[in-house]
Every structure is written in C-alpha cells, then in structure tokens.
Amino acid sequence: MLITTSRKPSQRTRSFCKSLVRVLNSSYINRGKMSIRDVLIKSSELGYNKIAVVSELKGNPNRIDFQDEEGKIIFSLEVTVGIPNSNASSKSRVKSESLKLQSDVPELDQLGKIMDIPKFIEGSPMENLLVIKRGDEKNKAIIQFYGSNGIETGPKIFIKEWRS
C-alpha cells in the first residue's frame, strides 16, 4: 500500500506517515502538487493496488482514507494519533512482512484485508502484531503495534469513527 498525505501536510502528519511505513509493509511519497490520479499512477508503478491518504485538521492527522486502484474510497477512519518519540520507538522493531492482525472489533477486521495483513493465530507468539482493541466512549477503537520482541512500538491510532 502507498501512503500519502493531503496537500501541504504539517510536520506532525509527515512524521505519522513515516512511522506508519516503519510498521506496515508500505511506502510513503510526498504528495506535493500531485493530484489523487497522479498518486494512483505512482502507486501502480510501485506495484501497489491501494493507497492511504492521511488528511489533517489543525496540523494533526485526523482521517485516513483507503482507496482502491480506481480512486474509490473503500474505507475511511476518523482518528487522532499518538506518535512516539524516537527513543521509545527504537526499543522494538516490527518486521512488517511478518505482521499479523488481532482484532477485538469485528467491524474493523476488513482493515486486514485492505492492508494485506493476515489474521493472528491463537497460540502464536505475541510479536509483529497490529492489535485493534475496543475503546471507550471517546474512541471506539485503538490500534497498537507490537514489535518482534513483543514490546509496543510505533504510532498509536485512536479511532473515533469509521465508514466503509
């Protein structure tokens, strides 16, 4: 999957996208003046069939739209994010090619299909995981990443709303 931003992203949004690339099997491109059509062309040149466009509100990432190769939005998340400082995230690395999905929220299971992440098999070691947990009244769900040593790493994504 190719990750990009809305035009003229803030530093925080760029940092979030780069931290996503470190935990997902994906690439990031600076959008600049590219149209979505240009981003889709670049995506297919790089061998991806989906893109994730990170939009922002008041300088912070606030929405992730997943689009297919035709530019149709297939899933949308309204989010707030926690971006770890570099010291915290360096303690654990995710092997993105070995990433598995563990979800407590059945409605968000399709994120695994969208991002080509296989499901976690019970009894397997708790490493290289994307975990979706139920949230509270403010956030419906929380996405956390666990590295190859089982320690939490990468961005924490608080999901306020989703649409498919």
PLM features per residue range, with description:
Residues M1-S164:
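Phospho-regulatory, Ser/Thr- and acidic-rich intrinsically disordered linkers and terminal tails
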